[in-house]
């Protein structure tokens, strides 16, 4: 993309100056994209542990546009100017479907509509003002809406994987950005080493083995991000309470099942906070959140998802509910005072559209004559090999009054779970 095509630049604390074109500026200035300024990147709760964690999905989306463009421009497989342009705008729009409080809102959205934030992104790109502006700027709306969520049907599957894969620009940006704003220093990764050593094998993105140490650092950093920030016990306590508030208020207000584009765009962190404070069914929870009167973790342990009981815990809500009831019965308190939380920490990044085995990342090495030989990461990295299972955390939350008694009951009820390490409080 030639310099004279750029309209100007935006200064970003992570990537420095991000140049944007006039077409990109017109899309950035839409209500749909500007709404992301009012949706925190980490959702609610992280700022209660890391006070600097107030960054939003807007700057993250700009960072993805920047990295997506660099990756597309530097792939050895030559892309034309239109394809690079499409990748930049699709990465910019990949998060527009998020509801208020980001992933905390998603379970309620999915329960009420059967949709994910990716589905909502496609809907907004196709039906909101974005469609008219994209067409005016000579983009194909259908292609952009699918590419933005990694679902476009193309022989060039690696275009999807720039946005949605095991090592995509979304993850590259949020690891750097979340680390910077929280101050948790897990995110010191040389992402450009990854970008400049990527290639395409059988239509899939792959990383040159010369960058193996950087790829290993990337994977370990992602584990660190989940453990230190995303699934921090206090962050999860806040989010569990917020999920309760959302469910309670939705029974009266019905905001999660909106069929209106404009009504959905009205939902952001600010407007939803006001709704939850004013709704009688959620008001008391919001008062507790405002005073940082949070649920307390009374029991915590870790286990691995290959165990059959562990898998059922993760996938079967009725089993988790039954265990909550058993813990409450032993403690002689109401079931609603016990919450079993089982977040899953991804070891090797797994969320991708590759045709390879789950949790594996294509890598390759070059022979002397320049031939690229594909390998599996698990075959060449001793660091990655033991991380081929998901480490999961099981926590039991209750209020301060019942904390010690619930801890005792939880140990008895969960004694059959293959917990490898228990944390004492």
Describe the function of each predicted region.
Residues 91-92:
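Elongated alpha-helical scaffolds
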Residues 1-86, 96-425:
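Histidine-centered, transition-metal-coordinating active-site segments
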């Amino acid at each position: 993309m030639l310099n004279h095509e750029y309209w100007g630049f935006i200064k970003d604390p992570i990537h420095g100056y991000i140049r944007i074109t006039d077409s990109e500026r017109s899309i950035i200035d839409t209500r749909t994209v500007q709404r992301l300024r009012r949706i925190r990147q980490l959702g609610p709760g992280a700022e209660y542990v890391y006070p600097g964690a107030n960054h939003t999905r807007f700057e993250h989306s700009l960072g993805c546009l920047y990295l997506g463009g660099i990756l597309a421009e530097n792939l050895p497989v030559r892309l034309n100017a239109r394809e690079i342009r499409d990748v930049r705008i699709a990465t910019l729009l990949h998060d527009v479907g998020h509801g208020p409080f980001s992933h905390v809102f998603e379970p309620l959205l999915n329960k009420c509509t059967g949709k994910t934030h990716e589905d909502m992104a496609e809907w907004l790109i196709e039906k909101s003002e974005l469609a008219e502006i994209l067409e005016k700027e000579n983009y194909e709306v259908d292609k952009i809406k699918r590419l933005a969520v990694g679902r476009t049907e193309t022989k060039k599957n690696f275009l999807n994987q720039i946005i949605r894969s095991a090592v995509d620009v979304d993850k590259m940006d949020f690891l750097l950005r979340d680390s910077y704003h929280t101050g948790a220093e897990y995110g010191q990764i040389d992402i450009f080493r990854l970008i400049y050593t990527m290639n395409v094998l059988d239509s899939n993105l792959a990383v040159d083995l010369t960058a193996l140490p950087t790829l290993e650092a990337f994977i370990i950093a992602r584990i660190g991000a989940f453990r230190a920030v995303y699934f921090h016990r206090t962050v999860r306590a806040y989010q569990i309470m917020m999920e309760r508030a959302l469910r309670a208020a939705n029974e009266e207000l019905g905001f999660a099942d909106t069929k209106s584009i404009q009504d959905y765009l009205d939902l952001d962190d600010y407007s939803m906070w006001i709704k939850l404070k004013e709704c009688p069914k959620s008001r008391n929870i919001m008062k507790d959140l405002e005073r940082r009167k949070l649920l307390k973790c009374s029991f915590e342990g870790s286990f691995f998802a290959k165990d059959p009981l562990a898998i059922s815990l993760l996938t079967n809500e009725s089993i988790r509910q039954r265990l909550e009831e058993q813990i409450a019965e032993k403690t002689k308190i109401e079931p609603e005072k016990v919450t079993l939380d089982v977040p899953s920490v991804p070891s090797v990044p797994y969320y991708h559209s590759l045709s390879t085995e789950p949790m594996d990342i294509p890598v390759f090495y070059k022979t002397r004559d320049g031939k690229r030989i594909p390998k599996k990461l698990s075959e060449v990295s001793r660091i990655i090999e033991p991380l081929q299972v998901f480490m999961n955390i099981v926590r039991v939350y209750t209020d301060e009054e019942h904390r010690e008694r619930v801890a005792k009951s939880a140990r008895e009820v969960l004694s059959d779970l293959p917990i490898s390490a228990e944390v004492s409080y």
